[in-house]
Structures are given as C-alpha cells and as structure tokens.
C-alpha cells in the first residue's frame, strides 16, 4: 500500500489543509498516511510564511529530501501552503527535484498535478486562487477522534501592515451556509462532538444562504451549528477584534455550546503601534469586547497573539502591553518578535530597536503569561470540569484523557472499570473533579452522579 507523509508548519488552517491533502490522496489513489518519511511514496510540505526565514527553512527541509529522491526516483515531493504561494516556480528552480508546487486554494488538484508530473516528466506548479472551489472537490472527512476542524472561510482582506496572509491566501471568501452545516452534520454522524470553526478572520464570515440573496453572519452560523444533533461543543479561531459584533457577544449569553474560552488576538496595546500595524481598532475597543463578554461569563478564559518589537516600539509602548496582559489575565498566548515579511508595508519601516532589547521584552512577556497559566491551573484544583474524553492517556494507556473548555489536558484513572467500558467513554462528556495541577496538564477523578 502506498503512503503519504505530510509535514505541517504554522496555523490550524494549515493543519486542516494537511488533513485534506491526505483525504484527497486517499480517496483518489488509496494512499495512507505515515509518520515515517522514509516509508512514503509522496512527501508533502505544507508551509507557513508568517515567521522569519520561512523560505530558507523549507529549502533546508527539501535539501534533506534530495538524497531520498536519489534512492527512490519515483518518490513524489510536493510543496504547498503559503511559501508555495509566495515562491511559486522559483521553488523548482532552486530544487529541481520537487515535483509539484501548489497553493492553499489548489490542494484539491493534487491528484491531477501528480498525474501530470508522472505523465510529462515536468514539475507542476499551480498557485492560483480559485474562489472556494476546493471545497466542492474534497472527499468526506475521515474522522479521527471526537473533535474536528471545519473551515468556513478562506483568505483575509484586512491587510495588516506586517502580514503576508492576504497575499498568500487571497481575499476573504466564505463557504456557503448550507455547505458548512452539511459538513458539520456529517461529522456529527461519525461521532464528532466538538467542532472548531476555522478561518483567517473567522468572525468575518458572510455565507450565502442557498437560493436566496440573504447572507448569514458568523453569529447565525454558530446558532445553527449548535442545533445540529450530536454537537456538544463549539470553538472557533482565529477571530479579529474589528469584526467582533454585538450579536456575537450576545450569543455567549444564550448558547451554552460555545466554550468558555476565546482566542482574540490583540497584537499590541499601544494605540500608536496598533495604528502603524493597521489593525483597525483601539485598545479601549478591544477591552470593551472582553468586558462585555465577562459580564455574560465572568470566568471567561482568554488567549491572544502578541508582536513584540514592532518598528518604533518604545519602552512606554511595551509597558502598555504588559499592563493589558496583567489586566486581562491571559491564559496562554502566541508571542513573537516582529520579523519583516517581504512585500508588506511594515518591512519598509525604520527599526532602530536593538534585537537584544526585543528579546528581553519577549522573554518578560512570555514569563508573565506562563505565570498566569500556572496560576489559572492551580486555581482549577478543587473545581469540577466538564471534559470531552479524547482517548487513552499518552503516559498510561489504562487511564483516559480529555480537555476542559479552556483547553487543559486532564488525565484521570478509572480503577476497576473494564477496558470495554473505558473505550465506550471516548467521545463522551464527563464531569471530572480536578485534584492536581502540573505545568502542562491536570489530574482529576471522575464524578459519579447518583
């Protein structure tokens, strides 16, 4: 049986796309996924261009594949994702042994690209932006576990000054309303209990409602997803403060299936820096969203993205960012030092802050966030958490593990419970009393209801 190996870089959108690459090749050619690159007949790199030196990391990986290709001449090597969109045919120029180059919107064409490569002997490049076409050509998802991602839109139209995403993934395009609901319903029928709705700016969703001129916004989509039998939890990422409507805020007051956690990237807490970033909101507007959410859910868990060392960032600007972090009490974050991306407006900004200063700021920010994370975990001891059981514990297969609404892994034992009964609990929602907090997980005991 032929096998495909996929290495994924970057965001959850890329993770979703990688799963779809496997689904497409399985449905068309019977390829099965493998974790061993040396066993693969097809090797795909799903790339990300958000961080610095992304291109060089890709070519470094490709260089290691050259020897493997020499031993296995029929091996197919492909490069997809955002670096593929940026570099296109130049990837083949630098690495002639690459067989196919494809963008995020053309992954569904992989079987045809591979077939043309094998037929013609010529490397194939397709980095076009066909609007939403790929979703019409994807096979049904192969479910693994009780949680699943569902992409509801593609691209970004915000054009933040530092970001390459609009150039690599295209403008915002929403999937039709009924298509999203049909995919979620299909997943629920296969045992999925938790869906994560995905988009570059997921709350900018504007989906056409079949046969009418009406458009469904993100809040309406969530309401309908919540009505699908079997779906018990709804997450989404990534949201944009500029698109966080009052309708979406109000939904947290009446939709229990929306988890009590939100990832809402702020990037910075200086209005001057936010303006230079072209984010489209002020710090006050951002804090207003959190204030209104916590009026409805006082213990709402928050996470965010932060960029440290944006050109012109002063000590006073950074102090404002740290003040916001302390005020909100973020529970995890994705934080980075600014790296200029070629072709973006911010790449041309004057930057006179020494790298050592930026690094020191980042370390201070990350240490503060980590203190918040540990404090929140310790405060969960003694509470009863509703968790979705995902499967056996990684360290002890006789135990089970699941996740809380704020994404904590919880391990728990079931002494005296037969294996068959434990297996039936996978995919179920259970109450667990938290007894211990560790740096990266929690431990608890299942609560038996009388």
From Swiss-Prot:
Pfam families: Radical_SAM (PF04055), TRAM (PF01938), UPF0004 (PF00919). [4Fe-4S] cluster 2 binds at residues 156, 160, 163. One of its GO terms (molecular function) is metal ion binding. Residues 2-119 form the MTTase N-terminal domain. Its cofactor is [4Fe-4S] cluster. Residues 142-375 form the Radical SAM core domain. Residues 378-448 form the TRAM domain. SUPFAM superfamilies: Radical SAM enzymes. It catalyses: N(6)-dimethylallyladenosine(37) in tRNA + (sulfur carrier)-SH + AH2 + 2 S-adenosyl-L-methionine = 2-methylsulfanyl-N(6)-dimethylallyladenosine(37) in tRNA + (sulfur carrier)-H + 5'-deoxyadenosine + L-methionine + A + S-adenosyl-L-homocysteine + 2 H(+). Binds 2 [4Fe-4S] clusters. One cluster is coordinated with 3 cysteines and an exchangeable S-adenosyl-L-methionine. Its main location: cytoplasm. Its EC number is 2.8.4.3. GO terms for cellular component: cytosol. Transmembrane segments: none annotated. SMART domains: Elp3. The keyword Nucleotide-binding does not apply. [4Fe-4S] cluster 1 binds at residues 11, 48, 82. Keywords: 4Fe-4S, Cytoplasm, Iron, Iron-sulfur, Metal-binding, S-adenosyl-L-methionine, Transferase, tRNA processing. The keyword Cytoplasm applies. InterPro entries: Elp3/MiaA/NifB-like_rSAM, Methylthiotransferase, Methylthiotransferase_CS, Methylthiotransferase_N, Methylthiotransferase_N_sf, MiaB_methiolase, rSAM, rSAM_horseshoe. It is found in: Cytoplasm. Catalyzes the methylthiolation of N6-(dimethylallyl)adenosine (i(6)A), leading to the formation of 2-methylthio-N6-(dimethylallyl)adenosine (ms(2)i(6)A) at position 37 in tRNAs that read codons beginning with uridine. Belongs to the methylthiotransferase family. MiaB subfamily. Monomer. This is tRNA-2-methylthio-N(6)-dimethylallyladenosine synthase. It comes from Cupriavidus pinatubonensis (strain JMP 134 / LMG 1197). The lineage of its organism: Bacteria, Pseudomonadati, Pseudomonadota, Betaproteobacteria, Burkholderiales. The gene is miaB.
